[in-house]
Design a protein with these regions (language model features):
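Conserved catalytic breakage-reunion loop centered on the nucleophilic residue
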Residues: 1-112
């Protein structure tokens, strides 16, 4: 098994060096996915996280749009052989569909 130096936000290693869910961070991951699925923008999500004094993956007080987008794009959250599931597949699919629609809209609008 290849050992990664850095693991995704929402996870930690246990004493056996296995990747496990880091409960506090996993709640933040769920919160981000749920807000985005319910039509909140990346900026609105950032403001909500700041309001709750939620440290970002880089331990900054403010969550940048890229950090939020990285969470929303990380397939590990739906589970794999090494990573336990944090987000169910229905929520994952809803978020990915919205992201695709947003990207399509931006490309279409900017092409006009």
């Amino acid at each position: 098994m290849l050992i990664q130096k850095r693991i995704s936000f929402g996870y930690k290693r246990n004493v056996l060096n296995e990747i496990t869910v880091y409960k506090e961070q996993a709640e933040v991951v769920k919160f981000i996915f749920e807000l985005y699925a319910f039509e909140q923008s990346l900026s609105e999500i950032s403001k909500a996280l700041e309001m709750y004094n939620t440290p970002s993956p880089s331990n900054k007080a403010v969550w940048g749009r890229q950090a939020i987008n990285n969470v929303l794009s990380n397939e590990k959250y739906i589970g794999s052989d090494d990573y336990p599931q944090i987000i169910n597949s229905e929520l994952w699919n809803a978020v990915q569909e919205r992201k695709c629609n947003n990207n399509y809209s931006k490309k279409y609008i900017s092409a006009k």
